[in-house]
Curated annotation (Swiss-Prot):
Pfam families: BIR. SMART domains: BIR. Gene3D superfamilies: Inhibitor Of Apoptosis Protein (2mihbC-IAP-1), Chain A. Component of the chromosomal passenger complex (CPC), a complex that acts as a key regulator of chromosome segregation and cytokinesis. The CPC complex has essential functions at the centromere in ensuring correct chromosome condensation, alignment and segregation. In the complex, required to direct the Aurora B/air-2 kinase to chromosomes. Also functions in spindle midzone formation and in the formation of polar bodies during oogenesis. Required for the localization of the kinetochore component hcp-1 to chromosomes. Involved in the positive regulation of transcription. It comes from Caenorhabditis elegans. This is Chromosomal passenger complex protein bir-1. GO terms for molecular function: metal ion binding. Transmembrane segments: none annotated. Expressed in oocytes and sperm. The gene is bir-1. One of its GO terms (biological process) is mitotic cytokinesis. BIR repeats lie at residues 20-87. Belongs to the IAP family.
């Protein structure tokens, strides 16, 4: 990647229904003609596929295991965690405004970073020696400014 360019967030690609739906290849309940909880319903409720009966919201990082009779939208809305997708409440992409789309994409990027930082903290806390911790910290990119002040003023 060229210097100064930013990698697109992994979760931002799930802003739209069609992209979330594409993640459901072998969703178990799609084979059940009586199931209310289909891949279409789960994707429409804001989830991408994480397993044969589960999905994760790109906008609140909530992962749920579903039953065939579940209503994915209801299950999503009854969770305590605040979710931007639930707050906006538009299950049809054609109803999303540009502002809605930007907010969802930004939220997905923030949630990706939050998840990455939580994973890094968990990994760091699992290291027992200070040498192992130091090795992990060396791998973290330095985001602090490295420019020096050109001020000629005295102290």
């Amino acid at each position: 990647m060229a210097p100064g360019t930013k990698k697109k967030s992994d979760m931002a690609k799930f802003t739209f229904y069609k992209d979330r739906l594409m993640t459901f290849k072998n969703f178990e309940y799609d084979r059940d003609p009586d199931a209310k909880c289909t891949s279409q319903a789960v994707a429409q409720a804001g989830f991408y596929c994480t397993g044969p009966q589960s999905g994760k919201c790109a906008f609140c990082n909530k992962e749920l295991d579903f039953d065939p009779e579940d209503d994915p939208w209801y299950e999503h809305t009854k969770r305590d965690e605040p979710c931007e997708f639930v707050r906006i409440g538009k299950l049809d992409d054609s109803e999303l405004t540009i502002n809605d789309t930007v907010r969802l994409s930004q939220t997905a990027m923030i949630m990706t970073k939050l998840f990455e930082h939580e994973m890094m903290i968990n990994n760091l806390s699992n290291h027992s020696s200070s040498d192992a911790l130091f090795d992990q910290l060396k791998k973290v990119p330095n985001t602090a400014s490295t420019t020096k002040s050109n001020s000629r003023r005295g102290k």
